[in-house]
Protein backbone atom coordinates (compact mmCIF):
# COMPACT_ATOMS: atom_id res chain seq x y z
CA UNK A 1 0.00 0.00 0.00
CA UNK A 2 1.37 3.40 -0.97
CA UNK A 3 1.48 6.37 1.37
CA UNK A 4 -1.05 9.05 0.45
CA UNK A 5 0.32 12.56 -0.11
CA UNK A 6 -2.08 15.44 -0.53
CA UNK A 7 -1.63 17.56 -3.65
CA UNK A 8 -2.25 21.31 -3.87
CA UNK A 9 -5.31 20.77 -6.11
CA UNK A 10 -6.90 18.30 -3.68
CA UNK A 11 -7.06 20.76 -0.77
CA UNK A 12 -10.65 21.72 0.10
CA UNK A 13 -10.59 24.85 2.27
CA UNK A 14 -13.84 25.75 4.02
CA UNK A 15 -14.76 29.05 5.65
CA UNK A 16 -15.74 28.82 9.32
CA UNK A 17 -17.09 31.54 11.61
CA UNK A 18 -16.89 31.46 15.42
CA UNK A 19 -18.66 33.89 17.76
CA UNK A 20 -16.17 34.58 20.57
CA UNK A 21 -18.64 36.22 22.95
CA UNK A 22 -18.09 34.81 26.45
CA UNK A 23 -15.50 32.23 25.36
CA UNK A 24 -12.24 31.47 27.20
CA UNK A 25 -9.26 32.80 25.23
CA UNK A 26 -6.84 29.87 25.63
CA UNK A 27 -9.35 27.18 24.74
CA UNK A 28 -10.55 29.16 21.73
CA UNK A 29 -6.98 29.78 20.54
CA UNK A 30 -6.05 26.08 20.79
CA UNK A 31 -9.16 25.07 18.82
CA UNK A 32 -8.58 27.71 16.13
CA UNK A 33 -4.89 26.77 15.78
CA UNK A 34 -5.92 23.15 15.10
CA UNK A 35 -8.45 24.34 12.49
CA UNK A 36 -5.82 26.49 10.77
CA UNK A 37 -3.40 23.55 10.61
CA UNK A 38 -6.07 21.18 9.29
CA UNK A 39 -5.62 18.61 12.07
CA UNK A 40 -9.36 17.88 12.07
CA UNK A 41 -9.26 16.58 8.49
CA UNK A 42 -8.46 12.97 7.57
CA UNK A 43 -6.23 14.15 4.72
CA UNK A 44 -4.00 16.26 7.02
CA UNK A 45 -0.48 16.61 5.64
CA UNK A 46 2.14 18.44 7.75
CA UNK A 47 3.97 20.11 4.85
CA UNK A 48 0.81 21.45 3.16
CA UNK A 49 -1.52 24.30 4.04
CA UNK A 50 -4.66 22.15 4.23
CA UNK A 51 -6.38 24.04 7.07
CA UNK A 52 -9.57 26.06 6.83
CA UNK A 53 -10.17 29.81 6.81
CA UNK A 54 -11.43 30.92 10.23
CA UNK A 55 -13.38 34.10 10.99
CA UNK A 56 -13.76 35.17 14.64
CA UNK A 57 -16.33 37.85 15.53
CA UNK A 58 -16.98 39.65 18.85
CA UNK A 59 -13.30 39.42 19.79
CA UNK A 60 -13.63 42.15 22.41
CA UNK A 61 -16.05 40.01 24.48
CA UNK A 62 -13.68 37.12 25.29
CA UNK A 63 -12.90 36.08 28.86
CA UNK A 64 -9.83 35.03 30.79
CA UNK A 65 -10.02 32.53 33.65
CA UNK A 66 -8.76 33.41 37.10
CA UNK A 67 -6.94 36.72 37.53
CA UNK A 68 -5.18 36.59 34.15
CA UNK A 69 -6.98 39.69 32.88
CA UNK A 70 -4.95 41.84 35.30
CA UNK A 71 -1.98 39.60 36.19
CA UNK A 72 -0.91 38.18 32.81
CA UNK A 73 1.80 40.27 31.17
CA UNK A 74 2.65 40.44 27.47
CA UNK A 75 6.25 41.47 26.76
CA UNK A 76 7.71 42.98 23.62
CA UNK A 77 11.03 44.66 22.90
CA UNK A 78 11.67 47.69 20.72
CA UNK A 79 15.21 46.61 19.84
CA UNK A 80 16.81 49.47 21.72
CA UNK A 81 18.55 49.11 25.07
CA UNK A 82 16.02 49.47 27.88
CA UNK A 83 13.23 49.01 25.36
CA UNK A 84 11.29 46.24 27.11
CA UNK A 85 7.57 47.09 27.02
CA UNK A 86 4.85 45.39 29.09
CA UNK A 87 1.10 45.34 28.81
CA UNK A 88 -1.82 43.33 30.19
CA UNK A 89 -4.81 41.76 28.41
CA UNK A 90 -7.05 44.31 30.16
CA UNK A 91 -5.16 47.18 28.51
CA UNK A 92 -5.36 45.54 25.09
CA UNK A 93 -9.08 44.67 25.34
CA UNK A 94 -9.93 48.22 26.42
CA UNK A 95 -7.60 49.73 23.80
CA UNK A 96 -7.93 50.51 20.13
CA UNK A 97 -7.40 46.96 18.78
CA UNK A 98 -9.02 44.39 21.14
CA UNK A 99 -8.79 41.65 18.49
CA UNK A 100 -5.02 41.46 19.04
CA UNK A 101 -5.53 39.34 22.18
CA UNK A 102 -6.94 36.48 20.13
CA UNK A 103 -4.47 36.98 17.28
CA UNK A 104 -1.49 36.81 19.67
CA UNK A 105 -2.87 33.73 21.42
CA UNK A 106 -3.45 31.85 18.16
CA UNK A 107 -0.11 32.90 16.66
CA UNK A 108 1.75 31.63 19.72
CA UNK A 109 -0.06 28.27 19.50
CA UNK A 110 1.09 27.74 15.92
CA UNK A 111 4.60 26.48 15.23
CA UNK A 112 7.32 28.82 13.95
CA UNK A 113 8.34 29.03 10.34
CA UNK A 114 7.09 29.96 6.90
CA UNK A 115 4.23 27.45 6.85
CA UNK A 116 2.84 28.79 10.14
CA UNK A 117 2.98 32.33 8.79
CA UNK A 118 1.04 31.23 5.70
CA UNK A 119 -1.54 29.43 7.86
CA UNK A 120 -1.88 32.47 10.14
CA UNK A 121 -2.97 34.56 7.13
CA UNK A 122 -6.15 32.41 7.01
CA UNK A 123 -7.31 33.86 10.35
CA UNK A 124 -9.65 36.87 10.30
CA UNK A 125 -10.55 38.47 13.65
CA UNK A 126 -13.12 41.25 14.06
CA UNK A 127 -14.07 43.16 17.19
CA UNK A 128 -17.71 43.63 16.20
CA UNK A 129 -20.40 41.16 15.24
CA UNK A 130 -20.10 41.96 11.51
CA UNK A 131 -17.53 40.64 9.06
CA UNK A 132 -16.92 41.20 5.35
CA UNK A 133 -16.76 37.55 4.25
CA UNK A 134 -20.46 36.88 3.61
CA UNK A 135 -19.69 36.02 -0.02
CA UNK A 136 -17.79 32.89 1.06
CA UNK A 137 -20.87 31.55 2.93
CA UNK A 138 -19.00 30.63 6.13
CA UNK A 139 -20.21 27.72 8.23
CA UNK A 140 -21.00 28.66 11.85
CA UNK A 141 -19.31 26.65 14.61
CA UNK A 142 -20.85 26.71 18.09
CA UNK A 143 -17.63 26.32 20.10
CA UNK A 144 -19.33 27.00 23.45
CA UNK A 145 -21.47 23.86 23.17
CA UNK A 146 -18.50 21.52 22.59
CA UNK A 147 -17.44 21.63 26.26
CA UNK A 148 -18.91 23.40 29.28
CA UNK A 149 -15.47 24.85 30.16
CA UNK A 150 -15.25 26.71 26.85
CA UNK A 151 -17.66 29.42 28.03
CA UNK A 152 -17.26 31.49 31.15
From Swiss-Prot:
Signal peptide: none annotated. GO terms for cellular component: cytosolic large ribosomal subunit. GO terms for biological process: negative regulation of translation; translation. The keyword Transmembrane does not apply. This protein is one of the early assembly proteins of the 50S ribosomal subunit, although it is not seen to bind rRNA by itself. It is important during the early stages of 50S assembly. This is Large ribosomal subunit protein uL13. Belongs to the universal ribosomal protein uL13 family. InterPro entries: Ribosomal_uL13, Ribosomal_uL13_bac-type, Ribosomal_uL13_sf. Part of the 50S ribosomal subunit. Keywords: Ribonucleoprotein, Ribosomal protein. The gene is rplM. It comes from the Bacteria. It holds the Pfam family Ribosomal_L13. One of its GO terms (molecular function) is mRNA binding. It comes from Wolbachia pipientis subsp. Culex pipiens (strain wPip).
Amino acid sequence: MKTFFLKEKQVDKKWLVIDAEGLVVGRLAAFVAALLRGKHKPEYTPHMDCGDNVIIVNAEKVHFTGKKLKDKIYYRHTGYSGGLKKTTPDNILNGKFPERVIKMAVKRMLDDGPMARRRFENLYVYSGSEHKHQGQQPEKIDFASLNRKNKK
